Curated annotation (Swiss-Prot):
GO terms for cellular component: cytosol. Belongs to the UPF0246 family. It comes from Marinobacter nauticus (strain ATCC 700491 / DSM 11845 / VT8) (Marinobacter aquaeolei). This is UPF0246 protein Maqu_2499. GO terms for biological process: response to hydroperoxide. InterPro entries: YaaA (IPR005583).
């Protein structure tokens, strides 16, 4: 079983590290190729490309300019500890044990516009480049064209030595980088719904946090068979047999 999640826009390169263990991204050469093209952008072009403020455009243009290899613990940080956002609040990797990190390295991957596919402990330098960004590059009109089949092929390789179940806990924007028709695995997509105004509905903030919580549940309980995820019960969620089918698993939570 392999779980995939999205990255986050917010980054933390200041907090104490929960582990010194680190690895290198598998697609660093591809990231270098992208960075070389991104370095050609002026700050105002970065702002326009990403629909962000002038201040953020300046910050991210500077990040592109200072980005360099090799990655070391002095100039980079492990991805799962660098990303901050609702998913990562639920995941709470800062509290992981060494054994938790080791399990996560085998069963969790982070999709990324710049790095393609990251292992939790892969070092990365700060960046902002969402997968849906329409950045024309040497390989095509956007980042989906840039990554092509690479991410899917990497996932297939990882799944070949496993029970061939991919648990999709990523956003639609990021999951679009996976070519479903070429995926050699069963795909399971958990959905999280909260009771509000007389019905169960997906509330973005809660659903994102729940994706991280499910990863945490799988990691801390050493879950390797996807069906065991149906026991997920953190923060009051429970599996709904009635609302689920083979590939879409619905977890409900009653009013908080």
């Amino acid at each position: 079983m392999l779980m995939i999640i999205s990255p986050a826009k917010t980054l933390d390169y200041e907090s104490p590290l929960a582990t010194e263990t680190h690895t290198q991204p598998d697609f660093l050469d591809d990231a270098c190729e992208l960075i070389d093209q991104l370095k050609e952008l002026e700050p105002h072009q970065v702002s326009n490309l990403m629909s962000i403020s002038d201040k953020l455009g300046q910050l991210n243009a500077e990040r592109f300019q200072t980005w360099h290899t090799p990655f070391t613990p002095d100039n980079a940080r492990q991805a799962v500890l660098a990303f901050k956002g609702d998913v990562y609040t639920g995941l709470d990797a800062e509290s992981f044990s060494n054994e938790d990190f080791s399990f996560a390295q085998k069963h969790l991957r982070i999709l990324s516009g710049l790095y393609g596919l990251l292992k939790p402990l892969d070092l990365m330098q700060p960046y902002r480049l969402e997968m849906g960004t329409r950045f024309e590059n040497t390989r095509g009109k956007d980042l989906y064209a840039f990554w092509g089949s690479k991410i899917t092929e990497a996932l297939n390789q990882l799944l070949a030595s496993d029970d061939k179940v991919l648990v999709n806990l990523a956003s639609n924007e990021y999951f679009k980088s996976v070519q479903k028709k070429h995926l050699d695995a069963r795909l399971v997509t958990p959905q999280f719904k909260d009771w509000k105004n007389g019905q169960y509905k997906m509330i973005s903030f809660y659903a994102k946090k729940a994706r991280g919580l499910m990863c945490r549940y799988a990691i801390q309980n050493r879950i390797t068979q996807a069906d065991d995820l149906k026991g997920f019960n953190l923060d009051g969620y429970y599996f709904s047999e009635d609302q689920s089918d083979n590939n879409n698993w619905v977890f409900l939570r009653d009013e908080q």
